[in-house]
Amino acid sequence: MEQRRPWPRALEVDSRSVVLLSVVWVLLAPPAAGMPQFSTFHSENRDWTFNHLTVHQGTGAVYVGAINRVYKLTGNLTIQVAHKTGPEEDNKSCYPPLIVQPCSEVLTLTNNVNKLLIIDYSENRLLACGSLYQGVCKLLRLDDLFILVEPSHKKEHYLSSVNKTGTMYGVIVRSEGEDGKLFIGTAVDGKQDYFPTLSSRKLPRDPESSAMLDYELHSDFVSSLIKIPSDTLALVSHFDIFYIYGFASGGFVYFLTVQPETPEGVAINSAGDLFYTSRIVRLCKDDPKFHSYVSLPFGCTRAGVEYRLLQAAYLAKPGDSLAQAFNITSQDDVLFAIFSKGQKQYHHPPDDSALCAFPIRAINLQIKERLQSCYQGEGNLELNWLLGKDVQCTKAPVPIDDNFCGLDINQPLGGSTPVEGLTLYTTSRDRMTSVASYVYNGYSVVFVGTKSGKLKKIRADGPPHGGVQYEMVSVLKDGSPILRDMAFSIDQRYLYVMSERQVTRVPVESCEQYTTCGECLSSGDPHCGWCALHNMCSRRDKCQQAWEPNRFAASISQCVSLAVHPSSISVSEHSRLLSLVVSDAPDLSAGIACAFGNLTEVEGQVSGSQVICISPGPKDVPVIPLDQDWFGLELQLRSKETGKIFVSTEFKFYNCSAHQLCLSCVNSAFRCHWCKYRNLCTHDPTTCSFQEGRINISEDCPQLVPTEEILIPVGEVKPITLKARNLPQPQSGQRGYECVLNIQGAIHRVPALRFNSSSVQCQNSSYQYDGMDISNLAVDFAVVWNGNFIIDNPQDLKVHLYKCAAQRESCGLCLKADRKFECGWCSGERRCTLHQHCTSPSSPWLDWSSHNVKCSNPQITEILTVSGPPEGGTRVTIHGVNLGLDFSEIAHHVQVAGVPCTPLPGEYIIAEQIVCEMGHALVGTTSGPVRLCIGECKPEFMTKSHQQYTFVNPSVLSLNPIRGPESGGTMVTITGHYLGAGSSVAVYLGNQTCEFYGRSMSEIVCVSPPSSNGLGPVPVSVSVDRAHVDSNLQFEYIDDPRVQRIEPEWSIASGHTPLTITGFNLDVIQEPRIRVKFNGKESVNVCKVVNTTTLTCLAPSLTTDYRPGLDTVERPDEFGFVFNNVQSLLIYNDTKFIYYPNPTFELLSPTGVLDQKPGSPIILKGKNLCPPASGGAKLNYTVLIGETPCAVTVSETQLLCEPPNLTGQHKVMVHVGGMVFSPGSVSVISDSLLTLPAIVSIAAGGSLLLIIVIIVLIAYKRKSRENDLTLKRLQMQMDNLESRVALECKEAFAELQTDINELTSDLDRSGIPYLDYRTYAMRVLFPGIEDHPVLRELEVQGNGQQHVEKALKLFAQLINNKVFLLTFIRTLELQRSFSMRDRGNVASLIMTGLQGRLEYATDVLKQLLSDLIDKNLENKNHPKLLLRRTESVAEKMLTNWFAFLLHKFLKECAGEPLFMLYCAIKQQMEKGPIDAITGEARYSLSEDKLIRQQIEYKTLILNCVNPDNENSPEIPVKVLNCDTITQVKEKILDAVYKNVPYSQRPRAVDMDLEWRQGRIARVVLQDEDITTKIEGDWKRLNTLMHYQVSDRSVVALVPKQTSSYNIPASASISRTSISRYDSSFRYTGSPDSLRSRAPMITPDLESGVKVWHLVKNHDHGDQKEGDRGSKMVSEIYLTRLLATKGTLQKFVDDLFETLFSTVHRGSALPLAIKYMFDFLDEQADRHSIHDTDVRHTWKSNCLPLRFWVNVIKNPQFVFDIHKGSITDACLSVVAQTFMDSCSTSEHRLGKDSPSNKLLYAKDIPSYKSWVERYYADIAKLPAISDQDMNAYLAEQSRLHAVEFNMLSALNEIYSYVSKYSEELIGALEQDEQARRQRLAYKVEQLINAMSIES
């Protein structure tokens, strides 16, 4: 599901306000269902839709005009600037607008629609025009969208108040060294007096020029503008001109418009009656009088269909073939345009649309011809809308050339003959809405957007094919239309596509989708060719060495092909030489490997284009499946140069012995031979024992040949003679022939006699089969010899056994039997039999050979259709026995109820069925039987029915329902009498047939057709056979139902959750249903009509077999409604309906049975119990204990069931949506009844207890009097405490509500002080070490510098040897003296040393991690402990690796929310008192750092003198009167130097704080001086309250004096007078500040005096009773933790959401994260670890806990800041929450849990779901190839290769080589690869070289 990200904050360049900016949302998650992944940018507000888009052709910046905003984006759609343009208070009726003069109209907050967005390249500015204030424009600086000018004080500045986008277009024309001109066309919405529809305006280079946007020429007689005449608007009230596109070409400016036609003298007041025409308007660039105005209609046609409604257009150059078709050059301009069909409904155009092309040269030629004809006096000016009448052309002898710009006659000029374009492509379904084109490799490539959010890619070749669509891409999953503006990136590799709410960057090609050369080169994409040795489809420039022969194939004939000889071998042939011929291959001299599928790979011998390979050995030959005689696999050639398989062909292994019959053997596709006498198939003919027994062709196989059908009557003894071919003569020792028959599963073997090689006979035998329901049984049989050698039966000959009597009980059925059976009717025995079995001599045996044979005694058994109308036409079906043997026998002898009924030949079934059609009955005929004769009407051939046929008169009474939707599909029921009579019925609604559904005697049901005449009533007519039933009924067609809203817009995968559908006319649907389609499968569920506007539905399941993952949110491919026949709602696009995963439950207990005590709640644990959907809808759970429901309470992970009062064992069932789940059973055990001894004991004990209670009561009464006074005293204390608790809670609540707004507005988001890369890396790698050797050049004492450097370069070679480096690290880790600190140090040194070779470092790191995982699992450690602690070099290297590769991500994305969180914590802490000694604060997230008593304080504003310029305004600084002087200094420094990095600021300890009282009197304030209060052994630090500093006092920070001085003796000042600052005391004798005495040495060490600030140390017992009282029940103050947490919540959320998102401001997820997570998944797969918790934990330990937690706790690693102790404590709480969010363990909390855990208890489940989704999203991203990763690592290495000194790092690493040299050399000598590379020797060389120098 698409999830919208919050918009981060940034400064906006608009001078009027600062706004919140959007984060770019980059889609890298997989679309559901095949959705491509593109960079996207979304609107920050759903209602602020995008309007225009343009791309700067120099910088590649993307500018987007939207409602209320103009955005500047980078090429990859990362936002840079958002410029606010609205909303503002306005009213369209205010003219001039209220920004010029006050307006009396009612003002409302009005959106500003961007209508024009043009780049003025020569002046580096952007022209943006909106709809506010009558359509004023702004000129914005391109770099930062700073407003250069916003002209608005003249009427020329108001372009149009139309607030609809797509109605205005502008073209900037600029001549060298001159001011520019802006040609602008706009719709005016009837305000023709205020706004011209077309004008040219001045565009001075100076933005402040008073002539800005003035008309180029404006006088009383002639102007550079055209207005719509009021007469035209009087004639056509909705007349307006919509400007769709504009451009400059040659010396002209062109506009493409759509406008209504204006018929002469006919007024049109309805917009629906308008006919629109699309026109080309041309003006000369240098024609301020507009004399050159020419307007011609244009469009195109195909197959007689006219396309006249312009939708979009684009000017481009033609490709070679298109230029040739137009007879122009490739440098000429061609206009590509999209039109919709017809000329009506411009604002709702038809889907039928066309892409057409117009050469500008052809347009100019037609305009020239129009001008010439008019100047010859032919016809009229034909511009009715502007001239109002027919104006005759004036003849003038004026030469008109290609550059003619008009005179003051014959202008403005129109025309009626359209400019016809070449139709390239049409579609009738998905209307095309936008177009863009460019030329690639000589081809015109056209990109067309559609109304359903798809992008068509079309190659425009010109005739005869026109345009060929070669690809279609789904850009917008929500199916919203693509808007007109599309633009290419400057490198033309991407196309920017825009919908109302999304800008998308789509690659112009996606060649990589084609995986074979054939697919690639037959795709039709001109960008794509086949990169042969890399086996990929790509552009030519992405294919390495594409210029070399056959490296890059551009046509399908150039594809590399492979032929192998032989193409197949037997499975028994091993290691055979195969000859492979490679056609069209590049140079293969680098080497080839032959791969046989995944079985084996061998070296190939290359000779030119021939390769010799050896087939697999016996161990590698594939096993052939039992039912096959061959197995094919891919024989692939792998290039050793690229490592890629670049060509393959099928190679087959065959097995002849799989064939059991001769024909299948010799007809096999392989070289198989049949051994006739051994009855086996073999690939080796030499294995046949007899030469003459070897068969190679099918003609030589022993086989049965076709003969006449073998018919055997059951019980008859008969031989079976068969024809054959090549029957073998059994050899000595071999048995003879047999016939084997399989009769109903029983095998019958009959001896057979071979007459010769072509004849065999099964001996005499009789055969039987069971049952009289089978008249003819086909029996499989085979001829075998020698026991089981089968003779082939290629024609599948069968023996047919039959019984004459079976299913032939009557004469008719008997004689109807096929004559081949020779069956006949034995009259005497009344049975069907063979002639020889009819033994009765007196009765004849009838068969077809008998003369004039007829069956007597016909019978009618049933009549179907027993009633009908007297008008006739009813078809009556008669079933019976002996109903004739030929149609002629019954053709004229059927009557029904006395009325002739005509039999129908086509319906006649011999002897069994007659169907006849009734004639017209005479008046008065009512009923009667059916009578018929067979041939002749003699008694023995006549019969009549027992059933009666009745004549009835059908009638209709009513109709239900009486209305239905226009699209039809309504089930209409017509009630009446005798409606079930007759054989057919027809119902008509108007002139259309109502589709028959069913009927009975009282009603007819049919389905209404779509209306052919629109809405309204239609008559209902009914016909029954030939009877027309009178009816006055009417059926009304009404508007189809419409759906407006679905609530909620979600369900779970199993569906069946309730949905409420709101819309119109919903009650006309009889059986509404709701449907979804997902992965090609459809699911439907039922709805119920509530009323005309409301339905209730049950959500369909996603699919019956869908099993979503725990974190999967799916969007169906289609969502809609089955509403009768309403097709428009089958797919409903106005919804974002999504499916959440099904809830899952754990078992109640491992055994499945949970023991419960009565009344105890049952807790069901699970996941996904509460889908995180917005709105109030929740899942409705029903829990049954047995059959009894229980009350349910639901949370995210558990379901609490209050059980009914039951005992015994009961099954628990959970119902939710369409799910039913049983987590087990509960066994409720009641307490057992008490025994008699127990009851006696309890009674005795109770008596004793009662006596004791009486005694205690007497004592208590006496004592209670004494306690009354104490109780009253305690009550007073409790009342006092209660009021203080209430006050504290009230304050905490008020803070919680107000502080978030205050904090958000206070924070300054400018200038984040990022550390440079080197400092950042050092703080992460070597924390606490500021000046590390790796930052300096290597320094060697003495003269050995060169030798040491030489030795270290040798060491560098060793370090770059993977075998050495791995052995080195493993050896160090085995040493006991190699401490944890050493491990971290070595890991950091290695990473700094390999900074320039990160590919190699990554390879080593992966190997170390793989070893670590192996070791972890071998030691039987729990897999979740992996990477938990830094106990190995690999773990620290992993941290450093992420530190290197995530630096860019930190700066561009994650750094901002982290810095904002730090600032928020710091600022929030400083808003309340902070104890300077203990670090405790009023506002804190940490319980340990919370002041737990009431501190009275006031906020003061101090005015600080600007230290840089004392004459500039003073800087106000917020402080607290309880702050110490040092705290005040730090706050002042923060305010004065707020945008200065901490390291560049002065330190508070180096500055003095002066309090200035007047111009001369200055007092230096200090934490400790002679005025400091000392009480007993406690000394309190001085605060502003102590000095009685008042609000708005003036202070200054001055550098600290080098030496203090004492107060002069002459000024005998008492201590009290200083502390009170009497007004009488002013020291004016010196310009220096008066300094209090220098602070004393901390007295704790000298005299036992303890210093305090706000609270004394809690452990001291000398506090006053009042102090202790103020701290009693300190937990009260924990509510402040909650207040602080609420204040900071948004900043924590922002940080977590950024870190747990795969989409970040347009930048992809850092490759390092995806690459490392995939590596961990691979390792889990390798070790068969399928536990998702383990995988989750590995990833959490790897990145969040290893890197992010470190950064969160230590923001000073990333930023140049100071982190105080209270800030550190709060960050630690956030970091702990972050760690808890990544954990998979259950979050169990109780009243004794730490407060920081309780603080975020409710948030952590949500954060956990973010983490799970984050990991799942990463897993779905496409894998990063090693090639892409290495390229990325190489780039990172290049960027930072010189940050650290390599030799210094190596020198530091060498110290470990030196320390453990013996162990290292020993390990190298034991390693085989190290021995082969003589690494131990090289180490000894290194040690010797370094030792010499030392």
Swiss-Prot record:
UniProt similarity note: Belongs to the plexin family.
Residue intervals annotated with topology Extracellular: 35-1237
Cytoplasmic side: 1259-1894
Keywords for this protein: Cell membrane, Coiled coil, Disulfide bond, Glycoprotein, Membrane, Phosphoprotein, Repeat, Signal, Transmembrane, Transmembrane helix
Modification sites for Phosphoserine: S1612
InterPro entries: Ig-like_fold, Ig_E-set, IPT_dom, Plexin, Plexin-A2_sema, Plexin_cytoplasmic_RasGAP_dom, Plexin_RBD, Plexin_repeat
Coiled-coil annotated spans: 1261-1310
Gene name of the encoded protein: PLXNA2
Main localization, broad class: membrane
Species assigned in the record: Homo sapiens
Superkingdom per UniProt: Eukaryota
Pfam families associated with the record: Plexin_cytopl, Plexin_RBD, PSI, PSI_PlexinA-B, Sema, TIG, TIG_2, TIG_plexin
Protein name per the record: Plexin-A2
GO biological process: centrosome localization; cerebellar granule cell precursor tangential migration; limb bud formation; neural tube development; pharyngeal system development; regulation of cell migration; semaphorin-plexin signaling pathway; somitogenesis
Glycosylation sites: N76, N91, N327, N598, N696, N756, N1205
CDD domains reported for this sequence: IPT_PCSR, IPT_plexin_repeat1, IPT_plexin_repeat2, IPT_plexin_repeat3, RasGAP_plexin_A, Sema_plexin_A2
